[in-house]
Amino acid sequence: YRYRDPILDETTAVLAITQSGETVDTLAAMEEARDKGALLWSIVNAIGSQAMRTADGHITMNAGPEIGVASTKAFTTSIVDQYLLAIYLGQLRGTIDAEQRRQLVRDVARLPALIGDVLDDDARLHELAGELYPYTDFLYLGRGINYPIALEGALKLKEISYIHAEGYPAGEMKHGPIALIDENMPVLAIALQDDLYEK
């Protein structure tokens, strides 16, 4: 981030997202933003961390301690925090009204039950793992806002299972990576029922 010479000034808001609040690269990026006059906020899991103290304001994840390297709870709660922030900013800017805000917040409140339903389908998850475990390379694809989710999915597989995986933008598949795909590489597509679903 710092070496990309970001264009920042006092009209820019920078949101630093960090689980520990102590990662050197994140803190250095925050200092870069501050030096250039940007408004600096953090989404942080570790209460009292340097990122929390350094920022002009903060949103806490409240995910609890991360035991594993994959940082799944912090990633998930940071996404929810960003979504809620976007909802409230949308209402303040007039792009959504109070009723739309309430509905979006209700939708977020349903997430724990929906995630629980997926986790409760242990037999299906076990079956899927049984089908996929022999493979040594995976490709995750996503379009638009789902591309970062594809990257994160590939990262989780690498960190937890020690299996090679890469995330890639679905629209760029035909520009090279498709040449690497064969029957020995499962492809996981993040394809939500949104405007990009038909692609």
Tell where the protein language model's regions lie, with residue ranges.
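Glycine-rich oxoanion-binding loops at beta->alpha junctions
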Residues: 1-17, 23, 164-180
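Short coil/turn segments at beta-strand junctions that form active-site/ligand-binding loops
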Residues: 10-12, 38, 135-136, 185
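Phosphate/diphosphate-binding loops
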Residues: 12-93, 193-199
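Active-site phosphate/pyrophosphate-binding segments
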Residues: 57-188, 196
